[in-house]
Amino acid sequence: MLLGLEQEFFVIPKEIYEKREDLKFAGRTLVGSPPPRNQQLGEHYYGRIPTIVEKVLSEVESELLQIGIPFKTRHNEVAVNQFEVACICDEAGVAIDQNMIMM
């Protein structure tokens, strides 16, 4: 059985992260505000990955390839500063192991 897994995550600048007690202590957003109205798809899902994030993802891809985990895709996700990476489909056991290492 082949399986293709993906990881979705947010990229938050360190200076903003350091100011957010909820992120530092709980590892997730506990306080916030509603999303802005009329978000355009071109601003996130179909938008260009910011250069600094592209650099980080290239470094991650390089590290994964060195340990034998082939990287298939990377792109923006629906929320602002949300991104996705996915490995190439593989046998279920291998794909699960690769996904756990990627996390």
Which ranges hold each PLM region?
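Glycine-rich, acidic/polar active-site loops that bind/position phosphate-bearing ligands
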Residues: 1-103
